[in-house]
Amino acid sequence: MPPPSPDSENGFYPGLPSSMNPAFFPSFSPVSPHGCTGLSVPTSGGGGGGFGGPFSATAVPPPPPPAMNIPQQQPPPPAAPQQPQSRRSPVSPQLQQQHQAAAAAFLQQRNSYNHHQPLLKQSPWSNHQSSGWGTGSMSWGAMHGRDHRRTGNMGIPGTMNQISPLKKPFSGNVIAPPKFTRSTPSLTPKSWIEDNVFRTDNNSNTLLPLQVRSSLQLPAWGSDSLQDSWCTAAGTSRIDQDRSRMYDSLNMHSLENSLIDIMRAEHDPLKGRLSYPHPGTDNLLMLNGRSSLFPIDDGLLDDGHSDQVGVLNSPTCYSAHQNGERIERFSRKVFVGGLPPDIDEDEITASFRRFGPLVVDWPHKAESKSYFPPKGYAFLLFQEESSVQALIDACIEEDGKLYLCVSSPTIKDKPVQIRPWNLSDSDFVMDGSQPLDPRKTIFVGGVPRPLRAVELAMIMDRLYGGVCYAGIDTDPELKYPKGAGRVAFSNQQSYIAAISARFVQLQHGDIDKRVEVKPYVLDDQMCDECQGARCGGKFAPFFCANVTCLQYYCEFCWANIHSRAGREFHKPLVKEGADRPRQIHFRWN
């Protein structure tokens, strides 16, 4: 039979030369067509082609090494049919040891060849690293930054670039897919990775410890089950059929084909939307970069703590259901700004009635008795929270803001701003390790309604530091911001610095407002002086906000303590019904 062309297998990955190409390994001799399976290596110069001596009694003359653009001088004589070289087995223990030694030397020569060959293009594969995979649970940073092809990825030895700094490298010369330790039900069946795949002794194959599928294909997008495309007509998995077949070190066909298929997926239009189904798991489907293998990630994306813009940009904003009950995500009160000046209440109601029953309101509507919103904005009070989500779906987003076209008698299709309130923006915990101390909490009055709790926390932490919690006060019925907030500090120094300033400039985006800062007053605190002994066990009505006091007092103790020199000008604070501390003037008897 004619010899294979030197360029027949050179179309593979440029950083990993083909093992079946004789141009790369001129020291190899073809296998004898007879029963002996040894390798014949020339011994000229004492080196023996890098192996150190002969390996077989059959001395077959090696073919001359082919060169670029130089045809072979003459075809080899016809030989009898022979078995494939990659699957021949030694007939004696001595020949078996010789075969293993030849394979080890071949690997060493191939690796040294790879290190001296320049790469023709950028490679997305990982570097050959020295540290190994950890056996513990994966860190959050690694899960968060995982690659969408991680289930089908494998390390390749050689000088190749690392695909992600968050991935842990492989150890030694063992090349294996990443091994995830998960307790999810989908991983309960027997793993497709055998127990001895990480062996590195002389009796194990260190090139590739498991048989890789030679044809890695992406299932159709509209298929009902990804697992169906991996099963044969008999109902058995192709991976299961090849599970016991270890990879032959002298046969690189399957590895080449697999890597070619994976590299072709680099330019696949479904990149980032659909991952390769991993054998041994139950249909690991990843849509929009989210996989069922990582339920922690999906939970964090849907727990309501994501950015508001991201929630508004989602295709469907409908509430989730938990235990048969719908979970509300938005307040039923929605701000509408930029209304036409001649639009009245009925026209506003007609413009938004298609989303659900609602009532139109604006500040001081009852007192002013006006039929038009005086300042060009109003509030929509929907009966159902699902109406708010339907309104959000109908809006147009631009620069992180939502708009909807509204018409008046003189203006047609005027874009008005729709500003819903996400309930998750009412609270933000910056440092969960610190307990919330009401004695280290401040009240912030006049907070702009678009300001979220996370933004309030960032501003206060930048000014005073030590912020562990921030909250926006909302009304109990509609859960809409009331224009006030609370900030809890983890230390007394930050708390005193904040209340000593009295006023803070809130700057964020379009917001630039000077607000007042006071101590957060509680209405269920006992007197710090008498502990209720002098007031019949009643709660203390007064709180002294001066930094020299910062205590709750009953009426008797207040008069007693603040009659001293230097404290007669202290002014007590009391809590109003709307969670707002009010300053009063204490009258001396």
UniProtKB/Swiss-Prot annotation:
The gene is CPEB2. Coiled coil: none annotated. It comes from Homo sapiens (Human). Belongs to the RRM CPEB family. It is found in: Cytoplasm. SMART domains: RRM. The modification Phosphoserine is found at residue 89. One of its GO terms (molecular function) is RNA binding. The keyword Lipid biosynthesis does not apply. Residues 332-423, 440-522 form the RRM domain. Residues 24-33, 82-103, 130-140 have a biased composition (Low complexity). It comes from the Eukaryota. This is Cytoplasmic polyadenylation element-binding protein 2. May play a role in translational regulation of stored mRNAs in transcriptionally inactive haploid spermatids. Binds to poly(U) RNA oligomers. Required for cell cycle progression, specifically for the transition from metaphase to anaphase. Residues 44-53 have a biased composition (Gly residues). SUPFAM superfamilies: RNA-binding domain, RBD (SSF54928). Disulfide bonds: none annotated.
